[in-house]
């Protein structure tokens, strides 16, 4: 504190793969990993925020089957050396493009231990306008505690699969929706790896002009600015971490290579879900795409982990081997 600080970034691309394929595992020193697309760097909008020792670390707004209801999970971080007694926490919901406040309530939060503290609040707003592909209404939820304030944009909506006489169908806010989608490989002009705001908006607008109501981030984690415009303009998205091939014969080696692989693939998935789980446009996570092996114990464990991080979205996992593909999914 009070001194000059240096933040250093190391960017590596040991494989240098400019092919569209990300399926071949390669050896990098003592590790096996998946190839990238030959690009590297800071791909998002990054900011460094200074806070007091009591601050809001995260807000997860969980949509509910009643689309006018939300469950708000707030992570308050106590970085002092001692537990804190009762603190006041203010929650406010207002229109994203407007001044109308729909909800404002102060809560008393008891006994904040040192470290992370999760608090859950249930909010039901019958007057809230629902988010849909035709009417993408957005709201801001603000949480204040101590001197810190955290604002998260979101939409009221519920996306689900229903069994209609043996036929699985998608529903958005209780109405059937037939998904018309295409894949985006996330190769972008100018720098290859990430879109400018102009290109991000253009992709969403182009998809809607073509009559699509959805796009897939194919074999790659998506970009926040693309999802931001999808939220604003009304386009659904499917997202997957990508590059999850690994020799099935080495799944249970329990050596440095396998430990690195499973730690790496799980970390990618965790970061993807935590970053993107408040976007109303994002409705499906896919854990693996066309992996040539049957699901293993580690795959089911990864799906349970993903579901615990975000129980509000559909999870799929496409694994296959001869003679036919097999899908494991949960919602």
Regions found by a protein language model. Name each.
Residues 1-218, 224, 229, 233, ...:
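Secreted/periplasmic carbohydrate-active enzymes, especially glycoside hydrolases
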Residues 35, 196, 254-261, 265, ...:
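Residue-level preference for long, well-ordered alpha-helices that form the structural scaffold
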Residues 180-184, 240-259, 265, 269:
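Aromatic- and acidic-residue-enriched carbohydrate-binding clefts of CAZyme catalytic domains
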Residues 221-222, 243-245, 289-293:
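Solvent-exposed loop/turn segments at secondary-structure junctions
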Residues 226, 246-249, 294-296:
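Extracytoplasmic/secreted cell-surface and envelope-processing proteins
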Residues 261-319:
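Active-site neighborhood of glycoside hydrolase catalytic domains
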Residues 320-331:
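Single conserved hydrophobic/aromatic residue that forms the stacking wall/gate
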């Amino acid at each position: 504190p009070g001194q000059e600080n240096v933040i250093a970034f190391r960017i590596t691309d040991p494989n240098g793969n400019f092919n569209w394929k990300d399926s071949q595992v390669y050896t990098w020193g003592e590790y096996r990993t998946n190839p990238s697309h030959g690009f590297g760097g800071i791909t998002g909008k990054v900011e460094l925020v200074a806070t007091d020792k009591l601050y809001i670390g995260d807000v997860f707004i969980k949509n509910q089957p009643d689309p006018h209801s939300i469950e708000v999970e707030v992570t308050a971080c106590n970085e002092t050396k001692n537990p804190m007694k009762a603190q006041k926490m203010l929650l406010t919901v207002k229109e994203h493009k407007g001044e109308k406040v729909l909800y404002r309530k102060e809560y008393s939060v008891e006994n904040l231990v040192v470290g992370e503290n999760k608090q859950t609040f249930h909010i039901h707003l019958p007057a809230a306008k629902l988010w849909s592909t035709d009417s993408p209404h957005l709201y801001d939820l603000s949480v204040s505690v101590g001197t810190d304030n955290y604002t998260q944009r979101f939409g009221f909506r519920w996306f689900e699969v229903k069994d209609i006489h043996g036929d699985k169908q998608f529903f958005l806010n209780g109405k059937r929706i037939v998904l018309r989608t295409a894949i985006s490989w996330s190769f972008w002009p100018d720098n290859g790896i990430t879109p400018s705001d102009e290109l991000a908006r253009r992709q969403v607008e182009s998809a809607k002009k073509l009559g699509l109501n959805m796009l897939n981030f194919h074999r790659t984690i998506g970009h926040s600015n693309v999802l931001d415009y999808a939220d604003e303009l009304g386009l659904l998205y499917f997202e997957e971490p990508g590059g999850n091939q690994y020799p099935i014969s080495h799944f249970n080696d329990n050596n440095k290579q396998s430990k690195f692989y499973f730690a790496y693939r799980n970390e990618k998935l965790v970061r993807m879900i935590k970053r993107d789980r408040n976007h109303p446009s994002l409705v499906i996570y896919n854990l693996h795409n066309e992996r040539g092996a049957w699901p293993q114990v580690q795959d089911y464990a990864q799906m349970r982990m993903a579901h615990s991080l975000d129980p509000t979205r559909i999870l799929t996992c496409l694994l296959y081997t001869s003679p036919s593909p097999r899908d494991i999914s949960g919602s």
